[in-house]
Amino acid sequence: LSGYLMTILDYGSELAILAIGMTLVTAASGGQDISVGATIAVAGSVVLRVLCGGEVSPAALHAPIIVAFLACVVVSMLLGAFNGALVAYFKIQPMVATLILFTAGRSIAAWINNNQLPVINDESFGWFGNFIPGLPLPTPIFIAAICIIIIALVLRFTKLGLFTQAVGINSESSRLNGLNPARIKFMTYVILGLCVAVAGFIK
């Protein structure tokens, strides 16, 4: 693959990862999370803050890349849990509930790095958003493919997929059959937070 097709797949990989989580959210709650763009900004800012330590252009990384990724995952999943709690337990419409982070998220992202845009010059960190030497495709394409395969297996061989669809089709009927609709809706937003973390890390 080369040229425009590779570019399209590269840029589309971020959207593909987000679509995985958004599909679960839409299936369970019947709404969309409009704050994903702002949450990605927060996730990326957390990564930069951990790796750069508040400096604009550090000579070396201030923390291992895996630590930055884990911090990004924790923050993104907490933001997803915040949205999920508003929708699942406070019964707020998804678009209204996620409007909070949609409005505040980018300001939070700017605050994390003191309105600066740090630059990371470490070559190994660049591999996650570009190419790993020796591989024919950009790394984000591989990461997106792995995420799609994992969620497909989870939905196919676990109860999560069935429960998510059941709650989305008829929440009250699911409750009468022993499911906990609020918990399942909450879980889908947390999973979306994880997807946002991965997308924010590679982009």
Functional labels for PLM-detected ranges:
Residues 2-57, 87-92:
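Single transmembrane alpha-helix segments in multi-pass membrane proteins
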Residues 24, 49, 78-90, 111-112, ...:
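Membrane-interface helix caps of multi-pass small-molecule transporters
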Residues 40, 44, 75, 101-105, ...:
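Transmembrane alpha-helical core residues of multi-pass small-molecule transporters
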Residues 90, 94-159, 184-187:
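Transmembrane helix-bundle core of multi-pass membrane transporters
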